[in-house]
Amino acid sequence: MPNIELLEKSMPVAPIRIAALAGCRELAEEVDKKLVKFRKELVAAKKSTIIPQGYAEKSFLVDCECPRFGTGEGKGYIKESVRGTDLYIMVDVTNYSLTYSVCGHENHMSPDDHYQDLKRIISAATGKAHRINVIMPFLYEGRQHRRTKRESLDCALALRELSAMGVSNIITFDAHDPRVQNSIPLKGFDNFFPTYQFLKALVKNVPDFKLDNDHLMIISPDEGAMSRAVYFSNILGVDMGMFYKRRDYSTIVNGKNPIVAHEFLGDDVHGKTVIIIDDMISSGESMLDVTRQLKDRGAERVFVCTTFGLFTEGLDKFDEYYEKGYLDRLITTNLTYLPPQLHDKPYFIEADMSKFLALI
């Protein structure tokens, strides 16, 4: 049960409605169930009989879709009125499981396709909804947040575009670099972290998990994850260490300078449980290399906590490292699409974020 007192003090801007794009519908339904439950409890706990219109509903979900023409072109369609509402549009730009037909050929939806559908729904609601908010757990083009060569600034461009379309607030999780919000200084940009949900999942699923400096250590897999590891270690009061990547800057492979080695900086990990924390697992190669090195250094158990499990190269390598004893647990959230077979893996733990989203 949420903190009723905090919810009671908040006054809604307008009646809430949730428009979930197809790739995020499952998560949105869970959020809707919890939001309905929270508000029913709040109404029951209130002594006052004055309840704002639209505050307690059987569901806050709005029926919407983005159908396609035979050529693959799409359109946004909201099937019920959202006039005067506080509209939250939920989108998962990483959900590659959805497909659509292009001239008879099946095409998997890319992040670009999801982003275009988001703009279509915004366009359908602009000028009608009282306020438009976008919940985009994985920030579109979040890894293209800066320019180091002759390249585009896709994330900043997307944020500016959404702002220009009338979006008041953008809600995301564990942005690769939250400083990208500087591109829209006059709009709301909320960046949340699933730290509590990681701890909750670990304590619930690992019975002998010990939260003290003698048994636990937090590890940053690279320089970019340092702020996350520092925060995690500070709230737990334990030591932290980090790896940094040595790259070969003379060559480029798949658009990146290849990693030559991971070098470790930190105290002895021998006999300790270590938690590696980062914002995402893409292919997972560098993360798995870090787990191997930590086990080689004598770590008793290695847990990986990552907000987004993308698994772009599949799960075979993770299975291999689990069987070899390099990886003990992998904790990731349900904020983005997860392959169904992942739920059957003995090392996988899901950190449920639906309650947190409902409270937001």
Predicted regions located by residue number:
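PRPP-associated nucleotide enzymes
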Residues: 1-360
